[in-house]
């Protein structure tokens, strides 16, 4: 097995090498050359049996930054290696994941967590969330979704989510996939405006601290076993 990497700038999936910066392994069939031009903004990959199976792109485009003109509705999911379009009409999709045989994806420009039928391409909205959705980790029946405050720039302006919510949040939403309800949200009030990815790390206890603990005047929180507690 090898480490597969989504190479957005070169519009391909690649692996690493001691002799080269990277080795291109796959590119969408509409991308005619490996070039540092971000032609379709290939940004996410879902693995099946240790190999890439689905990828998200922001447009079926073959020119430098060509996806930008259709970012609100030009996104799609492609099958690997065929480049078959599984579903289209998405708004800046990110973070495809396979979980229990279901293809999940974030329809970021609409702030949605959705599922996609890999055979029919049918999209089903699980929940709309108050943020630009990017970064998805699923553990059991819970989905952890990254939320970002979009910037009013040429890239993020004029997206459907701007009309859907008056105010966007930055943080991590926890969604119960059975009830389709957001049961919790860790919101960053300051210091952080964007979440780029999420990973769930099982059986670990990390130190918890704000992004600027010294500035905030708070002490870090440490997790220790009960046996380490002082005995009075």
Briefly describe each language-model feature range.
Residues 2-5, 52-56, 102-105, 143-145, ...:
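Conserved beta-propeller blade signature
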Residues 1-2, 31-53, 74, 85-102, ...:
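Beta-rich, blade/repeat-based domains predominating
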Residues 55-72, 146-167, 217-223, 229:
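Short, conserved, GDST-rich strand-edge loop motifs in beta-rich repeat architectures
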């Amino acid at each position: 097995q090898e480490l597969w990497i989504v190479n957005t700038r070169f519009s391909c999936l690649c692996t690493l090498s001691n002799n080269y910066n990277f080795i291109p392994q796959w590119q969408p069939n509409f991308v005619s050359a490996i070039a540092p031009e971000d032609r379709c903004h290939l940004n996410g990959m879902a693995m099946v049996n240790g190999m890439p199976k689905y990828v998200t792109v922001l447009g079926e485009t073959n020119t430098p930054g060509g996806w930008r003109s259709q970012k609100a509705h030009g996104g799609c999911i492609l099958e690997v290696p065929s480049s078959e379009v599984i579903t289209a009409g998405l708004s800046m999709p990110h973070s495809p994941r396979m979980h229990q045989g279901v293809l999940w994806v974030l329809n970021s420009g609409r702030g949605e967590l959705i599922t996609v039928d890999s055979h029919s391409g049918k999209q089903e909205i699980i929940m709309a969330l108050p943020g630009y959705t990017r970064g998805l980790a699923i553990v059991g029946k819970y989905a952890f979704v990254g939320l970002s405050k979009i910037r009013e720039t040429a890239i993020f302006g004029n997206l459907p989510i701007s009309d859907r919510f008056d105010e966007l949040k930055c943080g991590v939403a926890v969604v119960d996939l059975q009830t389709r309800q957001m049961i919790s949200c860790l919101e960053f009030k300051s210091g952080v405006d964007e979440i780029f990815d999420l990973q769930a790390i099982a059986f670990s206890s990390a130190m918890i601290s704000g992004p600027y603990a010294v500035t905030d005047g708070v002490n870090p929180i440490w997790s220790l076993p009960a046996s380490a507690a002082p005995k009075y």
